[in-house]
Amino acid sequence: MSEQEIFRRKSLEELKSRGIDPYPADEYIVTDYSTEIKRGFREDSPRWEVSVAGRMMSRRIMGKVSFVELQDSVGRIQLYIKCDSLCPNENKDLYYIVFKKLLDIGDFIGIKGYVFCTQTGEISIHVNSLTLLSKSLRPLPIVKSKDGMTYDSYNDVELRYRQRYVDLIVNEGTKDIFLKRTKIFNSVRSFFNEKGYIEVDTPVLQSIPGGAAARPFVTHHNALDIPCYLRIANELYLKRLIVGGFEGVYEFSRNFRNEGIDKVHNPEFTVVEVYVSYKDYKWMMNFTEQMLEHICIEILGSTELKIGEYIINFKAPYRRITMIDVIEENTGVNIAGMNENQLREVCRFLHIEEDKTMSSGKLIDEIFGKKCEWKYIQPTFIIDYPKEMSPLCKCHRQNAELTERFELIVNGFELANAYSELNDPIDQRKRFEDQLKLSKKGDNEAMFIDQDFLRALEYGMPPTSGMGIGMDRLVMLLTKQTSIQEVLLFPHMRPEKLDY
C-alpha cells in the first residue's frame, strides 16, 4: 500500500470519528450539470442557485479561499469555496479540517451555491454547502495540460484497458468514444425501425453453434447434462423467424469466438444482423450503402471521414468487384476453376502458409486476406464468392460454382457480410454434410449440422437477403480508432495477478 493510500485511510477514519459518513446512503438531489451551467449563465440574469455533484479533479487552497475543479458526468466546472460562505457560524471545521485536510482529489462531493463569473472571466459556482458523497482511497494519475499540450498523461495501453474506469476519469477523449458508440448504435436502430423491421432477441447459449465458420466457446448445462456453446452468430435463429412469417427482423448480437486477438478481433464482439424477405444481395448492397451514408451524415455531419492520410467517402455508390477479379487484380493469378491442389500451389507461389486441413474455400480466404483485403481503403463490395466459402448462401444465378455473397471492405478490413440466403433445404443439407467432411479432415471452424434449422427450411422460407455489420468495427471507423480494444469498454485480456 502506497503512502498516499495509507494517508487516505487515516483520513477515512478521521471522518468517521467526526460523525461524517464517507459513503452516505441518502439521495443527493442534482438539479444542474456543468455544461448546462456554462451554456446558460448570463451575468445580467437573476441569481442562479444550483445543486451539482461530481468528482474533485484538482484543488488550489489559498488561505480562506479555495478553488476546485469538479468533474460531473458531462464536463468540468470551477468551484469557488470561501471559508465564511461555507461556514457562516463560528465553527469553521468544515473548511479548515474536513475540506482542507480530510478530503482528497478523486473524492465525490455534492455542492450547492450560486453561479457567477470570476474576474478572469471563468464561469464558476460560489459554494455555500458541501457534502461528502464518496471517499476515494486510491490517488488518481495526474494529467497536466498547458498551452494545449498534455503532460504525464495516462496513456499506458495495457493499464488503460485493465483499469478503464481510471481511463474514463482522466482521459476525456475516452469517454467521448463511448458516447459516440451509443449514438452510432441508436442511429442504426432508428434506421431499421423506420423501415418497419422488428428488433428481436435470440439465444446466446446454444446447443448447436451455427451461422459462421468459427471455433466456439464450449460450456456444460448441468441440469440438462448437455454440452452448450456460446453464440458465434445469430443467423440461423433469425432465418427461423423469417420462416415464421416476419418480413424484416434485426438483432444486435453479442457473439463469442474462441480465436485470436488483434487490432480488429476480440473474442467477444457485437454485430447487428438484419434479414429481409423477398430481397437479394443486390438489393442489400444498395440498402447497405444507404444505411452507412445515413449514419455518417447523422453522426459526423458528412459522408467523408479523414483517417490518417486517407479521406474515406461513404457516399454511394461503392465499387463492386468479384472475389476472382480482386485476387487477380492484386496477385496476377486467375484462380477461377482451380481445384484444391492448384490453390495450394498458388499459396506456395505467393508465400502464404497453408496446411492439410485447409479446404479450397479456406485457401482462397487466406489468399484474399494476406494479399488483397488490406489494400482496399475506400468502401468496396467484394462479391460472388466461391461456393465452398459460403455454405449458407444461395448459388449464383449465372454460375453454380459461385454464391451471391458480398463483403464490404473499408479501411482495409471487413465491415459487413451479406448473402442472398440459401432457402433450398435439400441443397442446405448437402452443404452441411460437406462441412461435416471438412470437420473430419481437421477443420475446427467447419459448421455443425443443425437438424432443426433444416426442418424449419422444409416448411418454406421466402427469398431473403441477410446482412451483418461488425458494430465494433463501425465504431472504430467513425471514431478514427486503429484498434478494436479502443472501442470496447472492457476488452478481453489475460487475467492480472493482484497482490493485497
From Swiss-Prot:
Annotated binding of Mg(2+) 2, by residue: E414
Gene Ontology CC: one annotated term: cytosol
Broad enzyme group: ligase
Entry EC no(s): 6.1.1.6
Compartments it resides in: Cytoplasm
Keyword presence, ATP-binding: yes
Cofactor note: Binds 3 Mg(2+) ions per subunit.
Binding residue positions for Mg(2+) 1: E407, E414
UniProt catalytic activity: tRNA(Lys) + L-lysine + ATP = L-lysyl-tRNA(Lys) + AMP + diphosphate
Protein's UniProt keywords contain Cytoplasm: yes
Cofactor: Mg(2+)
GO biological process, one term: lysyl-tRNA aminoacylation
Quaternary structure note: Homodimer.
UniProt similarity note: Belongs to the class-II aminoacyl-tRNA synthetase family.
Protein known as: Lysine--tRNA ligase
Lineage: Bacteria, Pseudomonadati, Bacteroidota, Bacteroidia, Bacteroidales
